[in-house]
Amino acid sequence: MMRFTKFYAPSLKEAPKDASLPSHIFLTRAGFVEQIGSGLYNFLPLGKRVLDKIKNIVKEEMDKAGAQEVNLSFITPASLWQESGRYNVFGKELLRFKDRKKNEFVLGPTHEEAMLSLVKNKITSYKQLPLHLYQIGLKFRDEARPRFGLLRCREFLMKDGYSFHANEEDLGREFELMYKTYSQILQRMGLDFRAVEADSGAIGGSGSKEFMVLAKNGEDDILICENCDYAANVEAAKRAKKTCQDERPEANYASKFHTPNIKTIDSLAQFFKINAFYTIKAVVKKAIYENESKLVVFFIRGSDDLQEIKAQNACSALELVDASEEELEKAGLVAGFIGFVGLKDIDFYIDFELENEKQMIMGANEKDYHLIGIDVVNLNKDRFKDLIEVKEGDCCVKCGAKLKQSKGIEVGHIFKLGQKYSKAMNANFLDENGKSQPFYMGCYGIGVSRLLAVAIEANHDEKGCIWNKTLAPFVLEIIVSNLKDEKALEFANKLYEDLTNLGLEVLLDDRNERFGVKMNDFELMGFPYALVIGKGLENNEIELIQREDLVKELIKTDELMEILKKKVL
């Protein structure tokens, strides 16, 4: 019997001072969650009910796909992370600690190493493959600035799965299966999402897709083609190669021109009266590695911008930071006049789209001079990388239509890890020829607690949460407008019992509060429907309110059950 007088849902009149996003404001105010520290949250009964529904959907679909559930320790020996090589790569977000015996451990943000250790030396033959194990449990990332409530916290509930395969083809099959499984999970939750091309980040691997729920407060920029199914995170987006109809600058190869104080692309284009499309921009960054740092130069078209994650991946750095003027001078680089012709002792990369371009303009590596007539040919193929930031209005790499930029929130990520971890940790099996081979691995994560917040980011109004029937903690709230009205209270109790017996999740608001307070709480908590039992009962009428648009409908009591079965059940 779920009556409001017995239900623990402490609501707040004011939002937390650090709350800026609707999900953070409403979930805290409505009593779904309670913050107990920086990036740390308790889930109260309302939040736990939603969390359980999300977990059940995830579990049902994963089990249907043939994955098997396990439950690994929250704590992982640091030696496993050292063995895989990720101990230092992951950075400060990985919480490291020692026990009383000085043994080193980590709180796992992901469990590739732990899961590989689980199957290592136990799965020994190709006959035991493929295998897919998953868990739904707590993870921890020591975020520098936890914010946005459940969207960027330190402790979170996540489903992480790991698959093991005898060959790359079978890994590809499982990757496609998980693509369909994740799509089904999010469809069942009623969320508007896109599966997008993505960067693999610290987890690594040969390919990955992110699952993004569209929301105007999304933290990620994504590019979507509305003509085909192409979608990508801006960090990984590609485009059809750009062209320009304006005239190219004409000059002999690598002619040197005096360009006094012409340090920017705009001033360079104006100086030569050309489109910036025909210029080459140099962006200098300091690349941070595990044991060293060095300057790296990235050359892109003057009309484009550098995408820093792409640049970081191109040079395999842990991080890229801006280079100072002193560092440039020490390396012999002249800011505003850098080019790759004659560039010595410095790593450099060139954007793919510049390969085989002709009659370009770029710096001459000499103050106040540029080179005209540069042909980007006969260079080492390894220097050419995808470096540019794709933008709205660029053309789709698949069909050529215009790309549109949207905001999204990442809720899931699937990876083809290949043999990266199995080789590092010497985890092998015997193939059908009796030869020892490293496993091919995939990993698949979905943010369970994050989905709770994402559902509200995608569905809310100025009054509060708007839950759909699939995720709502209660599908229907019965509100008695006046507890002194004994007939109304008796009718509400009987209706509550009848609906509960039908399997409907109902909350009976039997509090001795003003009607306005009850309505405000209904709108804040966001249950899909409310039945208001008040004076209309004298005329055998009850008011049904739909939370999504707050439309009200008077229903005759003798038609009530039939209408509820159609709309609510």
Curated annotation (Swiss-Prot):
UniProt xrefs under InterPro entries: aa-tRNA-synt_IIb, aa-tRNA-synth_II, aa-tRNA-synth_II/BPL/LPL, Anticodon-bd, Anticodon-bd_dom_sf, Pro-tRNA-ligase_IIa, Pro-tRNA-synth_IIa_bac-type, Pro-tRNA-Synthase_IIa_type1
Reactions mediated catalytically: tRNA(Pro) + L-proline + ATP = L-prolyl-tRNA(Pro) + AMP + diphosphate
Domain of life (superkingdom): Bacteria
The protein's enzyme class: ligase
Enzyme Commission numbers on file: 6.1.1.15
Subcellular location: Cytoplasm
GO MF term list: aminoacyl-tRNA deacylase activity; ATP binding; proline-tRNA ligase activity
A GO biological-process term: prolyl-tRNA aminoacylation
Keywords tagged on the record: Aminoacyl-tRNA synthetase, ATP-binding, Cytoplasm, Ligase, Nucleotide-binding, Protein biosynthesis
GO cellular component: cytosol
Pfam families: HGTP_anticodon, tRNA-synt_2b, tRNA_edit
Family (UniProt): Belongs to the class-II aminoacyl-tRNA synthetase family. ProS type 1 subfamily.
Binding partners and assembly: Homodimer.
UniProt xrefs under NCBIfam families: PRK09194.1, proS_fam_II
Domain note: Consists of three domains: the N-terminal catalytic domain, the editing domain and the C-terminal anticodon-binding domain.
Functional summary from the UniProt entry: Catalyzes the attachment of proline to tRNA(Pro) in a two-step reaction: proline is first activated by ATP to form Pro-AMP and then transferred to the acceptor end of tRNA(Pro). As ProRS can inadvertently accommodate and process non-cognate amino acids such as alanine and cysteine, to avoid such errors it has two additional distinct editing activities against alanine. One activity is designated as 'pretransfer' editing and involves the tRNA(Pro)-independent hydrolysis of activated Ala-AMP.
HAMAP family: Pro_tRNA_synth_type1
Protein known as: Proline--tRNA ligase
Source species of the chain: Campylobacter jejuni subsp. jejuni serotype O:23/36 (strain 81-176)
